[in-house]
Amino acid sequence: AVYEHDARREDRRVDVPGWRLGQATSLDAAIAAHMEQTERAFALPSWETRLDVPPWMRQIALVTTLHGMHYTGFIFNDYARQLEILRWMATQIVPERVLVFLSSWDGRYYWDYPNYTVPARMGGDAGFRRLITEARKLGFKMMPMFGTNAANRKQPVWSSIASGATYKIDGDLYNINWVDWNNDRHQDAWLTYMNLGADAWRNHLEGRIADMIERYGVDAYFLDIVGGHVNSTTGDMHEGTKRLVENLRTRFPSVLCVGEMPYDALHGFIPVYHAGNGARWHKYSRFFQHLSAPAAGRGSSGVHEWGFSRFNTETLGLSPAAIPTLQVVDDTFTKYRDVMAAIIARAKSRANIV
């Protein structure tokens, strides 16, 4: 067993928690014992009793991921095209049963983190406002994406949020340096991993999310990499994440928080994710499929850095453990509308929608 002290503390004395050794007849039994303690410690509610799930979310039968602008600046679907797609989808399924995930709505994927402003090339303020307003009039629920813990040091805002960077317990600055964004065969390191336990970063991100909710009236917000907990010297990341979510929930009680992937304690205050959908976690939360899942045709991952993988024409890429998810990249609507219709039909069948 290993105990790691809170990195933000410089205690001269450490009292290590006591360990209780037990015996279980199976892995599932051992996990069940762990989860009983976790449920008590972090107040994990069951899905059926959650108060942080708006009624509309319980009726969602389909999630569609509309891919926006790639890191390179290539645009898969601008705001006008996204609205055109949704208007067509409204002829295929009741829009109230659809959650629309707007990935990279805010400019170049990750490069423009953490500005979260509406880029002119995608259609500007007027185009984004029209997309949200008209889509919501149809009945769709709209959810833009935000990075929980990523900021580009080359953006002008960096000096005001730099104190929110993550430093690991050994003092190392933690950079997001594992992606080769420009395909030059070297990982790029202009992103720093940020810590919501630090006031400067949490206040910035909370302010940007709140502004988008107030300005455009979106129904939900998505926290990218929210499950990437790090024991940081600059603050308690878990408590900072919880504080951000609870602050926004207090201000906007009808707006849903969705995370990319969970760790066990996150289920206490985030009810929906798009990764980590093992059966045991359905007791607490619901899931849809990752934005990197291959789209119909070439199997593009859209804005995500993965690239390409095979699209399964038999399963249509749908997981039995997740809310059916429709990926829309640059050629999906023009070349593979029949596959879109087939995915929508399966989602309707699974939800018993006539």
State what each model feature region is.
Residues 1-99, 134, 138-141:
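Carbohydrate-recognition beta-sandwich/jelly-roll modules
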Residues 10-19, 63-72, 199-200, 206-209, ...:
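Active-site-proximal substrate-binding groove within the catalytic cores of carbohydrate-active enzymes
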Residues 29-33, 37-39, 77-81, 123-127, ...:
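Soluble or luminal CAZymes and related metallo-dependent hydrolases
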Residues 61-63, 97-99, 139-143, 219-222, ...:
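Structural preference for beta-strand elements that scaffold enzyme active sites
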Residues 64-169, 203:
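Aromatic- and glycine-enriched glycan-recognition loops and surfaces
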Residues 89, 98-106, 204-234:
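Active-site groove signature of glycoside hydrolases
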Residues 104-106, 148-152, 226-229, 261-265:
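Active-site-proximal loop/turn and secondary-structure-junction residues that shape catalytic pockets
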Residues 127-133, 144, 148-211, 215, ...:
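Active-site-adjacent "subsite" loops/lids of carbohydrate-active enzymes
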